[in-house]
From Swiss-Prot:
Keywords: Cytoplasm, Fatty acid biosynthesis, Fatty acid metabolism, Isomerase, Lipid biosynthesis, Lipid metabolism, Lyase. The active site is at H71. This is 3-hydroxydecanoyl-[acyl-carrier-protein] dehydratase. GO terms for cellular component: cytoplasm. CDD domains: FabA. Belongs to the thioester dehydratase family. FabA subfamily. Necessary for the introduction of cis unsaturation into fatty acids. Catalyzes the dehydration of (3R)-3-hydroxydecanoyl-ACP to E-(2)-decenoyl-ACP and then its isomerization to Z-(3)-decenoyl-ACP. Can catalyze the dehydratase reaction for beta-hydroxyacyl-ACPs with saturated chain lengths up to 16:0, being most active on intermediate chain length. The keyword Isomerase applies.
Length: 172
């Protein structure tokens, strides 16, 4: 496993997407264009809203991002599910960063609220993920609350984001 750091740059996130960070058969991020994170600015096993750990990350929005021309023609908006997926990506990354084994999968979320939109003129998305618990059993399960800000304005909130890591189904 890679050295546990408190922040990660884009090239390191790409290495995670290639399966080079946490070892074979363990957590990895998707590669572009599905990677919804450009950098992790802070990650800690303690602190956050529930004092169970947190992760903060950013994504630079570009007017030519792949989703704008197709969602929707004449009214470009980033699909809300991509922001939600970014929250799940970070939740899974956190579990791998803790050294937990297995491949990640988004399992569920409690409540999701969309209060705003990401448009081509948006510059910066900021993710905040605060962990409520990490359960370690046959399946490692992380539960967290998340939020997404667009240029400093809160636009998405999600409660009880759940991501599991499982050794079953891992490609060997």
């Amino acid at each position: 496993m890679a050295e546990q750091k408190s922040s990660y740059g884009y090239e390191e996130l790409l290495a995670c997407g290639r399966g080079e960070m946490f070892g074979p058969g363990n957590a990895q991020l998707p590669l572009p264009p599905m990677l919804m994170i450009h950098r992790i600015t802070e990650i800690s096993e303690t602190g956050g809203a529930f004092d169970k750990g947190y992760i903060r990350a950013e994504y630079d929005v570009r007017p030519d991002d792949w989703y704008f021309p197709c969602h929707f023609q004449g009214n470009p908006i980033m699909p809300g599910c991509l922001g939600l997926d970014g929250m799940w990506q970070l939740t899974g990354f956190f579990l791998g960063w803790l050294g937990e084994p297995g491949r990640g999968m988004a399992l569920s979320t409690g409540e999701v609220k969309f209060k705003g939109m990401v448009r081509p003129h948006t510059k910066l998305l900021e993710y905040g993920i605060d962990f409520k618990r990490v359960m370690r059993g046959r399946l490692v399960l992380g539960t967290a609350d998340g939020c997404l800000k667009a240029d400093g304005e809160l636009i998405y909130q999600a409660t009880d984001l759940r991501v599991g890591l499982s050794k079953e189904g891992s490609a060997q």
